[in-house]
Amino acid sequence: MCGIVGALAFKGSSFTVTEPYITGMRDTMAHRGPDGAGTWISEDGRVGLGHRRLSIIDLSDAAAQPMSNEDGSLWISFNGEIYNHAEIRAELEQIGGHRWKTDHSDTEVILHSFEQWGIECLEKFRGMFAIALWDAKVRELWLIRDRIGIKPLYYSVHDARIT
């Protein structure tokens, strides 16, 4: 099971999200993902995501996380599995307008689904998942878990930030 972490400094906060801050949280979960680790910090230091990888669906480096869409406006750290990702990808390919980095990553399907349908994309997903998704266009952090909580998602609000 992968591990995801992140932080968001609230507007007006003096706190800055740094790579050591995210990496420190991420590396406490090294046992959750022996296949790799990644970190992303926004340019303004307001938000950061981290990921410990346990490769299941797409073993390629192109599927490493945190992952962004093609223009860098969406960033995701994801744990779980979208069982129907191939069907959703086929639908997105038929619609067109998306550039794919991977052959079959369910993480990338989530990103392009969010681009296409917004938060309503969740209605299409069948699976178990915990997701942290940063939408830079509207400056919103979405924390999402599957409907019955198979993949837990814990967060804390303190000191003008959420972690």
List each model region and its residues.
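Cysteine-centered catalytic environments shared across enzyme families
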Residues: M1-T163
